[in-house]
Amino acid sequence: MNICVVSTFDGTTDDYMKMFNATKEKAADFFTDYDIGIIREGKIALMIHITDMEKFQEAMSSEEMQAWDAKFNCVDEVYSLELMN
């Protein structure tokens, strides 16, 4: 399943990338490909191909992720994507 996660937070793009890169290895269990678009400082769009939605949801609700979200007041909006052609 392809999804888009739009994250808005009170930090920098570098803050987000540090968190993303630190958790990327763990996430290899549930995704195969991704692209990150920087909308502006404090807002990114992550397009990602999820292979195991249950593991993705576990990662998104982990203590580590909740702590990051609280520290940076992060709000994630998750959209499903479908190829249209």
What are these regions (language model features)?
Residues M1-W68, F72-N85:
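Short S/T/G/P-rich N-terminal loop/turn motif that feeds into the first structured element of a domain
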